[in-house]
Amino acid sequence: MERRGMKVLSMIQPWAALLVQGETLYETRSWKTRYRGPLAIHASRKVDKQACKYEPIRSLLAKNGYTEQNLPTGVILATCELTNCYQVIDADDTSAILDCGEVVTGDDFLLGDYSPGYFAWEIAGFRLLKPYIPVKGKLGLWEYPIGEELMVGSTEIIH
């Protein structure tokens, strides 16, 4: 029997928590992907402690009950859908323009790297896993075997 897997993206905290909690619509990367479909979000063991002290990040984390000390690490946090991947075509200090014509501003802009040439991955439909799945992360998109813990019944829809 063929074993199916789910694509997983590892992210440093606090970025993983902010994405999963719906504080930003996009995850920015220096590379594009043609993949569209189910995706799991993995919080790596690393925490960017400086970013956690920066406003508005500190307040957004606090709104969701997090501090730099209690962010979950080394776990798959949630599943979602990777719906699109847009290239950043222009940016200044407060906004960016994506190749789809969308203008990114506010917290979405502050929570990503919108350097021209980078890519904004549009991700939606988050389901928080209960409990989180402890696993070592990897670079790029990687596969995790689908098991009961990734089934819809063991998740809570958060946005």
Where does each model-flagged region fall?
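Structured alpha/beta reader/binder surfaces that contact nucleic acids or chromatin modification marks
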Residues: E2-H159
